[in-house]
Amino acid sequence: MQYLNAEGIVLDDGIIGKLEGFAVLLHEWNQVHNLTGARSVVAIYDNIVDSLYPLTFIRIPKTLLDVGTGAGFPGLVLAIALPETEVVLAEPLKKRVSFLKYAAIDLGLKNVTVEAKRVENVVYEAFDMISSRAVTNTKLLLDLTSRISDEHTEYLFYKGSRVFDEIAQVEGQMSYDIIQKNQRNYLYIKNET
Protein backbone atom coordinates (compact mmCIF):
# COMPACT_ATOMS: atom_id res chain seq x y z
CA MET A 1 0.00 0.00 0.00
CA GLN A 2 3.02 2.26 -0.39
CA TYR A 3 1.29 3.63 -3.52
CA LEU A 4 -1.16 5.57 -1.37
CA ASN A 5 1.32 8.11 -0.01
CA ALA A 6 2.70 8.71 -3.51
CA GLU A 7 -0.85 9.59 -4.64
CA GLY A 8 -1.39 11.98 -1.71
CA ILE A 9 -3.79 9.62 0.05
CA VAL A 10 -3.11 9.63 3.79
CA LEU A 11 -4.80 6.92 5.87
CA ASP A 12 -4.11 5.63 9.35
CA ASP A 13 -2.56 2.22 9.96
CA GLY A 14 -5.87 0.64 11.02
CA ILE A 15 -7.52 1.57 7.73
CA ILE A 16 -4.50 0.40 5.74
CA GLY A 17 -4.67 -2.91 7.62
CA LYS A 18 -8.34 -3.31 6.63
CA LEU A 19 -7.54 -2.48 3.00
CA GLU A 20 -4.82 -5.13 3.02
CA GLY A 21 -7.26 -7.59 4.61
CA PHE A 22 -9.80 -6.77 1.90
CA ALA A 23 -7.19 -7.41 -0.81
CA VAL A 24 -6.30 -10.82 0.62
CA LEU A 25 -9.97 -11.75 1.08
CA LEU A 26 -10.90 -10.69 -2.45
CA HIS A 27 -7.94 -12.57 -3.93
CA GLU A 28 -9.00 -15.76 -2.12
CA TRP A 29 -12.68 -15.50 -3.08
CA ASN A 30 -11.87 -14.48 -6.64
CA GLN A 31 -9.95 -17.69 -7.28
CA VAL A 32 -13.15 -19.67 -6.68
CA HIS A 33 -15.99 -17.29 -7.56
CA ASN A 34 -14.62 -15.10 -10.39
CA LEU A 35 -15.72 -11.80 -8.83
CA THR A 36 -13.38 -9.44 -10.69
CA GLY A 37 -10.89 -9.34 -13.55
CA ALA A 38 -8.20 -8.28 -11.05
CA ARG A 39 -6.54 -11.68 -10.65
CA SER A 40 -3.40 -10.81 -8.68
CA VAL A 41 -2.98 -9.02 -5.36
CA VAL A 42 -1.04 -6.30 -7.22
CA ALA A 43 -3.99 -5.78 -9.60
CA ILE A 44 -6.32 -5.62 -6.59
CA TYR A 45 -4.07 -2.99 -4.97
CA ASP A 46 -4.16 -0.98 -8.22
CA ASN A 47 -7.97 -1.05 -8.06
CA ILE A 48 -7.87 0.01 -4.40
CA VAL A 49 -5.68 3.02 -5.26
CA ASP A 50 -8.00 3.86 -8.18
CA SER A 51 -10.98 3.70 -5.81
CA LEU A 52 -9.32 5.90 -3.18
CA TYR A 53 -7.76 8.57 -5.40
CA PRO A 54 -10.90 10.78 -5.34
CA LEU A 55 -10.38 11.28 -1.59
CA THR A 56 -7.80 13.86 -2.68
CA PHE A 57 -10.47 16.12 -4.24
CA ILE A 58 -14.04 15.27 -3.09
CA ARG A 59 -16.03 16.60 -0.15
CA ILE A 60 -16.42 13.72 2.28
CA PRO A 61 -20.09 12.67 2.35
CA LYS A 62 -22.13 11.56 5.37
CA THR A 63 -24.03 9.07 3.18
CA LEU A 64 -22.88 7.32 0.02
CA LEU A 65 -24.58 4.98 -2.43
CA ASP A 66 -22.33 2.93 -4.70
CA VAL A 67 -24.18 1.68 -7.80
CA GLY A 68 -23.13 -1.74 -9.09
CA THR A 69 -20.42 -2.30 -6.51
CA GLY A 70 -19.24 -5.56 -8.01
CA ALA A 71 -16.33 -6.94 -5.99
CA GLY A 72 -16.12 -3.78 -3.88
CA PHE A 73 -14.67 -1.13 -6.20
CA PRO A 74 -15.11 1.64 -5.31
CA GLY A 75 -17.88 1.33 -2.69
CA LEU A 76 -16.46 -1.13 -0.18
CA VAL A 77 -13.00 0.42 -0.45
CA LEU A 78 -14.46 3.88 0.23
CA ALA A 79 -16.41 2.44 3.18
CA ILE A 80 -13.15 1.16 4.67
CA ALA A 81 -11.43 4.53 4.20
CA LEU A 82 -14.43 6.56 5.44
CA PRO A 83 -15.66 4.82 8.61
CA GLU A 84 -17.88 7.80 9.54
CA THR A 85 -19.73 7.65 6.21
CA GLU A 86 -22.82 5.44 5.96
CA VAL A 87 -22.31 3.44 2.76
CA VAL A 88 -24.95 1.51 0.83
CA LEU A 89 -23.66 -0.95 -1.77
CA ALA A 90 -26.21 -1.77 -4.51
CA GLU A 91 -25.27 -4.98 -6.34
CA PRO A 92 -27.72 -7.38 -8.02
CA LEU A 93 -25.43 -10.41 -8.57
CA LYS A 94 -25.77 -12.95 -5.75
CA LYS A 95 -22.17 -14.18 -5.64
CA ARG A 96 -20.92 -10.59 -5.35
CA VAL A 97 -23.55 -9.78 -2.72
CA SER A 98 -22.39 -12.80 -0.69
CA PHE A 99 -18.80 -11.61 -0.91
CA LEU A 100 -19.65 -8.01 0.00
CA LYS A 101 -21.67 -9.08 3.05
CA TYR A 102 -18.96 -11.48 4.19
CA ALA A 103 -16.21 -8.89 3.69
CA ALA A 104 -18.14 -6.21 5.59
CA ILE A 105 -18.59 -8.56 8.55
CA ASP A 106 -15.05 -9.95 8.40
CA LEU A 107 -13.53 -6.46 8.27
CA GLY A 108 -15.82 -5.13 11.01
CA LEU A 109 -17.42 -2.47 8.81
CA LYS A 110 -20.37 -1.16 10.82
CA ASN A 111 -21.03 1.58 8.24
CA VAL A 112 -21.95 -0.76 5.34
CA THR A 113 -25.35 -1.94 4.13
CA VAL A 114 -25.49 -4.28 1.14
CA GLU A 115 -28.61 -4.07 -1.03
CA ALA A 116 -29.02 -7.15 -3.22
CA LYS A 117 -30.83 -5.28 -5.96
CA ARG A 118 -30.49 -3.03 -8.96
CA VAL A 119 -30.26 0.68 -8.21
CA GLU A 120 -33.73 1.42 -9.60
CA ASN A 121 -35.14 -0.79 -6.82
CA VAL A 122 -33.19 0.86 -3.99
CA VAL A 123 -35.46 2.84 -1.65
CA TYR A 124 -33.76 5.42 0.58
CA GLU A 125 -33.79 9.11 1.33
CA ALA A 126 -31.47 11.22 -0.80
CA PHE A 127 -27.77 10.40 -0.53
CA ASP A 128 -25.02 12.98 -0.09
CA MET A 129 -23.00 11.22 -2.78
CA ILE A 130 -23.65 8.57 -5.41
CA SER A 131 -20.70 6.73 -6.93
CA SER A 132 -20.35 4.22 -9.72
CA ARG A 133 -17.62 2.54 -11.72
CA ALA A 134 -18.08 0.77 -15.06
CA VAL A 135 -21.87 0.43 -14.83
CA THR A 136 -23.48 2.53 -17.59
CA ASN A 137 -23.37 5.96 -19.18
CA THR A 138 -23.64 9.17 -17.18
CA LYS A 139 -27.11 10.20 -18.40
CA LEU A 140 -28.62 6.82 -17.52
CA LEU A 141 -26.90 6.80 -14.10
CA LEU A 142 -28.37 10.21 -13.32
CA ASP A 143 -31.82 9.05 -14.47
CA LEU A 144 -31.67 5.78 -12.49
CA THR A 145 -30.68 7.58 -9.29
CA SER A 146 -33.02 10.57 -9.58
CA ARG A 147 -35.44 9.16 -6.94
CA ILE A 148 -32.69 8.86 -4.33
CA SER A 149 -30.96 12.17 -4.95
CA ASP A 150 -31.76 15.82 -4.42
CA GLU A 151 -30.20 19.21 -5.17
CA HIS A 152 -27.51 18.53 -2.55
CA THR A 153 -26.41 15.15 -3.93
CA GLU A 154 -22.97 14.97 -5.50
CA TYR A 155 -21.84 12.28 -7.93
CA LEU A 156 -18.53 10.52 -8.36
CA PHE A 157 -18.38 8.44 -11.53
CA TYR A 158 -15.25 6.51 -12.46
CA LYS A 159 -15.16 6.81 -16.25
CA GLY A 160 -12.99 6.03 -19.23
CA SER A 161 -12.32 7.94 -22.44
CA ARG A 162 -16.02 8.42 -23.34
CA VAL A 163 -16.71 10.73 -20.40
CA PHE A 164 -16.65 13.85 -22.59
CA ASP A 165 -19.20 12.40 -25.03
CA GLU A 166 -21.35 11.27 -22.08
CA ILE A 167 -21.34 14.75 -20.53
CA ALA A 168 -22.52 16.21 -23.84
CA GLN A 169 -25.58 13.90 -23.68
CA VAL A 170 -26.69 15.20 -20.26
CA GLU A 171 -29.37 17.87 -20.48
CA GLY A 172 -29.33 20.91 -18.26
CA GLN A 173 -26.55 22.70 -16.49
CA MET A 174 -24.40 21.14 -13.84
CA SER A 175 -21.18 21.98 -12.11
CA TYR A 176 -18.56 19.30 -12.60
CA ASP A 177 -14.87 18.56 -12.78
CA ILE A 178 -13.18 15.83 -14.74
CA ILE A 179 -9.97 14.76 -13.03
CA GLN A 180 -7.74 12.69 -15.28
CA LYS A 181 -5.31 10.14 -13.91
CA ASN A 182 -3.68 7.56 -16.17
CA GLN A 183 -6.54 5.97 -18.16
CA ARG A 184 -9.16 7.02 -15.61
CA ASN A 185 -11.45 10.05 -15.80
CA TYR A 186 -13.09 10.83 -12.48
CA LEU A 187 -16.32 12.73 -13.13
CA TYR A 188 -17.18 14.74 -10.02
CA ILE A 189 -20.58 16.41 -10.31
CA LYS A 190 -20.90 18.94 -7.51
CA ASN A 191 -23.89 20.61 -5.97
CA GLU A 192 -24.03 24.38 -5.95
CA THR A 193 -24.52 24.84 -2.21
UniProtKB/Swiss-Prot annotation:
Places the protein is found: Cytoplasm
Keyword Secreted among UniProt keywords: no
Reaction(s) the record says it catalyses: guanosine(527) in 16S rRNA + S-adenosyl-L-methionine = N(7)-methylguanosine(527) in 16S rRNA + S-adenosyl-L-homocysteine
Source organism superkingdom: Bacteria
Annotated Gene Ontology cellular component terms: cytosol
UniProt GO molecular function: rRNA (guanine-N7-)-methyltransferase activity
One Pfam match: GidB
Enzyme Commission (EC) number: 2.1.1.170
Chief location: cytoplasm
Keyword check for NADP: no
InterPro entries per record: rRNA_ssu_MeTfrase_G, SAM-dependent_MTases_sf
Keywords: Cytoplasm, Methyltransferase, rRNA processing, S-adenosyl-L-methionine, Transferase
Residues binding S-adenosyl-L-methionine, per UniProt: G68, F73, V119, E120, R133
Enzyme class: transferase
Membership in a protein family: Belongs to the methyltransferase superfamily. RNA methyltransferase RsmG family.
Biological role stated in the UniProt entry: Specifically methylates the N7 position of guanine in position 527 of 16S rRNA.
Protein name per UniProt: Ribosomal RNA small subunit methyltransferase G
Organism: Sulfurovum sp. (strain NBC37-1)
